[in-house]
């Protein structure tokens, strides 16, 4: 149960009747530990995506911080889902989904796989989303396979992904499903046989996704998206080689961002268009966005205050950094005795709570 509620030559895309959605996966290497991670650079890369699943989230507050970075950078509203901590030993981590509200909607069903045979060290996070432009739903599994001492330690988890795919199809018959994440195993290994038998194929078949310490060199193809090609007939994808985009060395990239590059699936097959950097830094949406948010907050403040115990989802969505998923979680966790308890909600840390209180929208 979820406790609250991831560079090629990039050219401009030709116009199509369907807006493109970009789905990605990224192992963020201990995001949330006090390791000097540069979230503004993470956001600069993630801003090219519409839905991105993250592995190695060590503290859920980092997802809220990244969400705010993305909103400041893109001018769009973003939302997120974060799992509870998973793991068998003293080392635990969380999974997360970040998604752009104007392109992707969370439909429901977020849950950590129950794992009846206790195969997984870190049980995957499942959820269903909708492409807003087409109304098409799809299910996603966010996975981080244990590394262990050898491939023999990883193979049982890889084989058990077939059970997860079967479950996703049982829960949502006829809905396309993808399994994405850091698999710590190349897609050519025999352990993938069960998933291949079900018709799934790896999106990325060439190259590698983990950064070596030598600039321009990548070591292993561990990160991927497994999908049924007939369910995504136009899709293609690639590795986003972010050190090239950010103009940094692999040593710096590994220290400040991650030792994995994200991989992405372009639903319509369009090529990504790189967003401009200024002096090696992303260009924020700036004063226009700040003005728009201030105007929104001002106009909302004049409306009836929001009661955490009686407001509906649309009313709760008016609060800063509260999207549909968090609104649903607030309703589910009622009653609330004080606004301070909102830190129980995934992605709401003290900083976000302060913004909510400062908005003046909550009933006193």
Where are these regions (language model features)?
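Active-site beta-strand/loop signature of hydrolases that rely on acidic residues for catalysis
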Residues: 23-28, 42-67, 98, 127, ...
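Small-residue hinge/turn detector
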Residues: 323-324, 349
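Active-site-proximal beta-strand elements of phosphoester/diester hydrolases
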Residues: 20-30, 107-110, 136-147
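Alpha-helical interaction/regulatory segments in DNA maintenance proteins
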Residues: 299, 331, 340-364
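Bacterial N-terminal signal peptides
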Residues: 2-12
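Structured beta-strand-rich core segments of catalytic domains in phosphoester-bond hydrolases
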Residues: 58-134
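Acidic/histidine-rich helix-loop elements
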Residues: 25-37, 116, 146-153
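Metal-dependent phosphoester-hydrolase catalytic domains
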Residues: 60, 167-175, 185-289
């Amino acid at each position: 149960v979820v406790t609250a509620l991831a560079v090629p030559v990039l050219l401009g895309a030709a116009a199509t009747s369907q807006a493109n959605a970009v789905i990605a996966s990224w192992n963020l290497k201990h995001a949330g530990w006090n390791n000097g991670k540069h979230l503004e650079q993470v956001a600069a890369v993630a801003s090219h995506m519409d839905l991105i699943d993250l592995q190695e989230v060590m503290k859920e507050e980092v997802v809220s911080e990244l969400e705010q970075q993305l909103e400041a950078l893109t001018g769009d509203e973003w939302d997120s889902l974060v799992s509870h901590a998973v793991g068998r030993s003293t080392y635990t981590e969380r999974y997360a989904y970040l998604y752009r509200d104007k392109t992707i909607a969370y439909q429901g069903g977020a849950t950590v796989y129950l794992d009846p045979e206790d195969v997984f060290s870190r049980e995957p996070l499942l959820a269903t989303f909708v492409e807003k432009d087409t109304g098409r739903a799809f299910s996603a599994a966010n996975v981080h396979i244990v590394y262990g001492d050898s491939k023999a330690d990883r193979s049982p988890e890889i084989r058990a992904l077939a059970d997860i795919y079967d479950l996703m199809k049982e829960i949502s018959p006829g809905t396309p499903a993808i399994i994405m994440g850091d698999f710590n195993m190349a897609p050519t290994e025999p352990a993938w046989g069960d998933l291949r038998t079900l018709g799934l194929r790896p999106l990325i078949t060439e190259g590698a996704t983990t950064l070596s310490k030598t600039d321009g060199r990548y070591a292993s193809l561990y990160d991927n998206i497994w999908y049924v090609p007939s369910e995504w007939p136009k899709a293609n994808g690639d590795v986003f080689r972010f050190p090239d985009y950010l103009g940094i060395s692999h040593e710096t990239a590994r220290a400040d961002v991650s030792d994995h590059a994200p991989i992405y699936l372009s639903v319509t097959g369009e090529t990504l268009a790189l967003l401009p950097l200024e002096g090696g830094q992303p260009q924020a949406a700036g004063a226009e966005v700040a003005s728009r948010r201030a105007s929104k907050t001002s106009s909302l403040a004049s409306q009836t205050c929001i009661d955490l115990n009686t407001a509906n989802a649309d009313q709760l969505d008016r609060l800063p950094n509260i999207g549909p998923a968090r609104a649903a979680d607030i309703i589910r966790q009622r009653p609330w005795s004080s606004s301070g308890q909102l830190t129980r909600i995934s992605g709401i840390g003290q900083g976000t709570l302060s913004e909510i209180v400062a908005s003046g929208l909550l009933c006193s």
